[in-house]
Every structure is written in structure tokens, then in C-alpha cells.
Amino acid sequence: MLGEDEGNTVLEKGNNPSVKQGEVGAVFIVPKILIREHERVILKQILQILDQDELVQPPLDKFPYKKLELPKYIDELKTRDATNTSYKMIQLDAYGEKKVGSNGELFGGRHYLFNTFTFTAHMGVLLVLLQDVIKVLYQSNATHDEDEFIVQHDQILVMETSEEQTKFLAKNGVIPEESKGSFKYITARSAFVEFGASVIAGGQRIVDDYWESLAKKQNLSSHQRVFKLSTNLISKISLLRPSFQNNRISNANEISANTNNTCTISTSKFESQYPIVTEQPSAEIREAYIENFAKGEHISAIVPGQSISGTLELSAQFRVPRYHSKNSFQQALQMKAMDIPIGRHEELLAQYESQAPDGSASISLPNHIPSVNPSNKPIKRMLSSILDINVSSSKNKKSEENEMIKPMNKGQHKNNTSLNINGWKFESLPLKSAENSGKQQYYRGLPLYEKNTLLERLKQLTPNEIKELEHLHDAVFVNTGLQNVRKVRTKKWKKYWQYKAGIPIGLKRSQLDEFKNKYLKDVLAQTSVTTNFNEITNTDETITTKRVPNPNFLGNCNIKDFKPPYIYSHVNKVPQNVAGDKTAVKLDTEVKNTNANPVVATDPVAAKPDNLANFSNEVAMNN
């Protein structure tokens, strides 16, 4: 959604959608300035999150892989509403109803990205051509199969124009003048309900979605990318961020390699599983551990499973900032100035000393208290450490989490003694410099401040406000550091579950199709041949080892009963013949197992549907 000021600017310049009325209806053309403003907002949003893959969801010329899963919001009979232009909704969103009217009119300064129109036959309901909706979604002038699009979005009622309506749209510039025949169209409200922020100028996830409550339940973020970007916008991003150009070229090379049927997975350098996963220890180690544990002797043992460890000691990494010197608060208390801005303390100090009795000058408060270097001794916290119990050895331990935090505290910030005011020390606050004047950067969660503006603002703080400011900044430092650590540990967990599923550690989402269609077949096709001399029979024996998939292998499931309800595309959509005909609900991915080994082929105890890469070995003897 465009900001209020941006939306008002569009309207003030007279570039609101131009209205063309006639006997058949009215047409609302989207102004070009609105499209340019939309592109500017999207470009700004992408540049802000370009370094966060979980929000950008690359590649940019594809749809984001995290999208809103829509409910079944119409009935099975597809009953039409009172306007006879869309299906009646049996499920609504209270927040979404505040964003759009019953006739498709948007509220809250929102604008559609496509041209809309009305027909007198439909009582003023806003309509839109289906081809315009597809063009906005795909950001391309290429033609797409409308019938396939309708099948994918079967909750939208599609209508066709009459000959008179086609001429009206052609006359008013919605379609080319030489167009003939019928055109498919839908209501603008249906497009907003189905696609949400994707059809709104400057649309943001959740904010401009109809299903706002559902988006929050699905843990979507309002900062994540919404639109599939055009080639023009991607080139502008590459121009503004030259480092992004290299990533785009590498992605293009990967795509071209895939088109030549070359396996990118086999050439990829995947990570070893040993730093991530610790396998089950031997029986001797387990017995020794149990025996010593029974005697009360607790020895360290290898715990099978993930090796995700690493202590983060809060006291060592995040010290509470101190913006006061040793005597700052004592001086303010004696002057009764705890609620007076520190910029006036010098004046109050002069008055305090002038009112002091004779002979007391020796005990008067100093005018300027020198800056005290921060103590290297960490301040103790209630939670001195997290993630591990033993923190004594964590100080000397170089974990990946601690390495993630080091750049925040090393070589990025210099103390600015010019920020100290009457003994109050603000020298640790980050300031903008000539090196980063053109960038929006942060230091430990705090923005880089303008020196002159910051100095005037600091003079207005009172000692009580400084106490609160120290704790607020401390919370920002800790939260920023923990978020960085969470990113590292999230990657570790993803790698761990990749290993447990039989996937090469580090497999990318873009390689998933190749993994299923080519890599797994290559894994099954692997054989090993060894030749040994048998002294008893005085012959050479050739042993051929082949891989045979067990029921845990992807596409080799041996479960043949009812389908679980969660496999259907819609939650409320269940086939009517489930109870009557069991053959109608067999798994589509069922593969007949021709293995002669009954243990491998028919073991139901080990069956777990749709694991990715589990297999067993079969040995054949050839003399």
C-alpha cells in the first residue's frame, strides 16, 4: 500500500484513475504515475531486505515460495451472490472486510494495479479483465493460458463480455480497438480476495491482504517480498547494488546449465554431515556409561542426534551501556535535578556553588567530570548464559554464534568524546561518517545518528530518562545479538533435518526438482562390483552390490489405505466416494515393488511414507 502522503500526491496532481462513462458502463484507467510510484515503492522495499533471503525469497523473477494458503471460502454448490457476479462467500475475514467494499471499492488509500470498469447490467460492481489480472501477477506481456489459470483458481466466477460490451471496452482503451469476440472478466473484489497484496499498488503482505488473520496464523511477515519482479526492476536493483549483479549472473548460469540437462547437484559442494550430526555410539560405550552412571560416576557420553551446541554468554558479549560517570547521579541528586534536562545542569551547578556557605568551596561539585573508561568487568545478569549449562569454558570457545556477534563489536565504531555533556558519557553512541553517509546502517541495533541533531536531543534528557535509556539500549543490543544467533542455529537445524531425510546437506530449493527426478534415480542406479578369489573352490567370485529402495524411499510407499485429510488441496474438500470406494483413494505415488527380497519389500514396521532417500543393499553372487 502506498503511504498516505504518496497517495495524496497522486490525487492532488489530478492523476487519479480517469473515468470514462457511457451507456454500457464506465471505465477507470490506472494513471501512469501510480504505476511509477508503485515501482519506486517496490524497489525501495527490495533494497531494504536484499540481504535477507528469508524475506527476499530469491530468485526475484519468480514468485515467492512462501505464499498465503487460502481456505475454501465458497460452498461446494458454488452459489452466486445477490449481484450474480461472484460466488457467495461462506467464510469472511473481519479485517479484510474493512479494506474492500461489496462492490470492489478499496478503502484506506489503496489502489488497484489494473484497469477496472463497470457494466450497467451488473449494478455498478467493479470488474476487471482476466488477462489484466494475469498480466499484473506475472509481470509479463507474454500470453498465458486463461483456462489453466481458471482451473487453478476455481473459487472465482469468470464471465464473458457480449459484443456490445467488447466494443465499449475497445472504444475506451481497455482493450485494443481492433479487438473482436468475447473477453473473460471477473469482479475486482474477487481478485482482491484471491490475490490480496499482489494486485495492490505498493502492496505489503498482511497489511494489504484480505485474509489478514489467516496470514498472521501462517507466520507470514509484512516485510517479505510479494511481487514477481520484471526484468526492468531487476536491472535497476543490479545498478543500485552491484554485488547483486554477480548473484544474478550466477543464478542465470545455473538455469542455463539446467536447460542443457547437466546435473548441478553432482557438481555442487555439499557439506559433510559429521559436524552436524553425531551417530549412535557403540554398544560398549553405552554399557560403560550406564554402569558408571549407576555407581554415581557421571562421565561425558556421546549423545546421538544433532551436534548443535555453543554457549552464548550474555555478560561477556552484551554489557549494559553506561551513559553516566561515577558521580553523575550523585551530583544530580544533590542539586535536586533528577527531572531537569542535563543541558541546564551547568547553569544549576553555578547557582548551587554560589549559594554554598563560605568555606565550603572545597566540597563543591566539579564543573566537568572527566570521562571514565568503561569497565572491562561484565555486569552480572539473572540469566548469565543460555543454550548450555556449562559456561566456564565458553569464554575460550570459538563457536559460530560468537563469531556472528564479533563483527558487531569489532572495528566498526569509535568513541566520540564530543558527545559527553556535563559528565554524562554518550561517547559510545554511533554517529554517521563520510564513509557511510549514503547508506542506512545500524550498529548493534541502533541507527547511525547525525551528530548535531543527536547532541541537541541529548541535552533535553533528564537523569531519570537516562536510566531508562540505558536499559532500553541494553534490550536492543541483546535482542539484536540473539536474532543473529538464531539465524545461525536455524541454518544448523535445517541442515540437520536435511541429513535425517536423506538429502545432501546444503541442497537449494531451486535444485529440488532435479533432486527428485534425476539425483534419486542416479542414487538407485549406483552399483559396486568386487572380485575375490575363493581358495576352496579355486574360482574368482564377483560380488555385485545393487541398491533396492525400501518403503521409506520417496515414491515407494507401501501404505494402501485411506488418504489422510491433509493431502487434499483444500481443507474442506473431501472426495464424496471415500467411504464407498477404497480403490478411488489409492496413493498416486504408489510404485509396485518388484524386489524379490520379502524383508526389504514388505516390511510394514519400517514403513514411513515419503521419506526422501532411504534404501537397502542387495548382494548378488556371480561365479
Swiss-Prot record:
Pfam families: CRC_subunit. GO terms for molecular function: chromatin DNA binding. Keywords: Activator, Chromatin regulator, Nucleus, Transcription, Transcription regulation. InterPro entries: CRC_Rsc7/Swp82. The keyword Transcription applies. One of its GO terms (cellular component) is nucleus. It comes from the Eukaryota. One of its GO terms (biological process) is regulation of transcription by RNA polymerase II. Its main location: nucleus. The keyword Nucleus applies. It is found in: Nucleus. Involved in transcriptional activation. Component of the SWI/SNF complex, an ATP-dependent chromatin remodeling complex, which is required for the positive and negative regulation of gene expression of a large number of genes. It changes chromatin structure by altering DNA-histone contacts within a nucleosome, leading eventually to a change in nucleosome position, thus facilitating or repressing binding of gene-specific transcription factors. Present with 3180 molecules/cell in log phase SD medium. Interacts with SWI3 and SNF12. Component of the SWI/SNF global transcription activator complex. The 1.14 MDa SWI/SNF complex is composed of 11 different subunits: one copy each of SWI1, SNF2/SWI2, SNF5, SNF12/SWP73, ARP7/SWP61, ARP9/SWP59; two copies each of SWI3, SNF6, SNF11, SWP82; and three copies of TAF14/SWP29. Belongs to the RSC7/SWP82 family. SWP82 subfamily. This is SWI/SNF global transcription activator complex subunit SWP82. It comes from Saccharomyces cerevisiae (strain ATCC 204508 / S288c) (Baker's yeast). The gene is SWP82.
